[in-house]
Curated annotation (Swiss-Prot):
GO terms for molecular function: sodium channel regulator activity; toxin activity. This is Delta-ctenitoxin-Pn2a. It holds the Pfam family D_CNTX. Disulfide bonds join 37-51, 44-57, 48-80, 50-65, 59-63. Residues 18-34 form a propeptide. Expressed by the venom gland. It comes from Phoneutria nigriventer. Belongs to the neurotoxin 03 (Tx2) family. 06 subfamily. InterPro entries: CNTX.
Length: 82
């Protein structure tokens, strides 16, 4: 009985570990895509979605990713949509 409980515990841990590893791989791919997009001089999108909420949309230029307050980025984004 103890052997069966030990075996089932190991099996549950193995399945949980595999699930966590798959989630980690998905997250790494997503982060890599975001970092790559932010490092390139791409045309400014209306939503600046490449930069997330920290984007400053420069009209006629690339989407510049920088740290800052959300409402400043939103104001810059609104000016670009004119």
């Amino acid at each position: 009985m103890k052997v069966a409980i030990l075996f089932l515990s190991i099996l549950v841990l193995a399945v949980a570990s595999e699930s966590i590893e798959e989630s980690r791989d998905d997250f790494a791919v997503e982060e890599l895509g975001r970092a790559t997009c932010a490092g390139q001089d791409q045309p400014c999108k209306e939503t600046c979605d490449c930069c997330g909420e920290r984007g400053e949309c420069v009209c006629g230029g690339p989407c510049i990713c920088r740290q800052g307050y959300f409402w400043i980025a939103w104001y810059k984004l609104a000016n670009c949509k004119k």
